[in-house]
Curated annotation (Swiss-Prot):
Protein name: Transcription factor atf-4 homolog
Organism: Caenorhabditis elegans
Keyword annotations from UniProtKB, A to Z: DNA-binding, Nucleus, Transcription, Transcription regulation
Ranges for domain bZIP: 138-201
Main localization (coarse): nucleus
Amino acid sequence: MAYVNEQNPQFLLYNGMHNQTHSTPQYHNHHHHHHQSPTYPQSYFNPYSHQSYQQHHLNSDVNFQMVPQSTSVPPDPFCSIEPMETNVQAKEQILEEIVRECEEIERRSNSSASPASNWSSDEHDSQSEKSYHPYKTPEKKERKKAQNRLAATRYREKKRREKEEAMTCIEGLSVTNGKLKDQVSELEREIRYFKKFMTEMGMKTVTD
């Protein structure tokens, strides 16, 4: 019983808990005070088994120390990196899908634009042909033929005038060419005359 009252640091926690939870019993009978000893809960103290009490006290210390460790562990700063990377990858995949869809839409619109434009041009041509060739009566057909004959006659007359003008120009140029040739012949004749005159005057050495 002496080891319970000693100032052993291993029993400070137990003594404090015992003082808070179990107060020292008051003994009113002074006659039996020397015969009675303070009683303790059997679950915490056994005077005949100090080893089992010490083991129970150590286990309680271990449990008391492990509780704050489980709650005081700081969160891992890197635990949120993987979700962030996952979110970034998901956003990039969404953007890539949007870009591919836009390119596909643009490609389809470009591929469908050319047939549509061709169809519209063909339709416009057919409409113009219909407007140019409406349903004709025999009178309109004769009138159209007369207009075509008149246009052909005007075209042939125009070509004939152009041809006559060209021939007139050719004739004028031919006359001018003949005159120039005559002038050349006259100049050559005069050159020969002056050479002969200078030879007769003894000016041959000078001319040479």
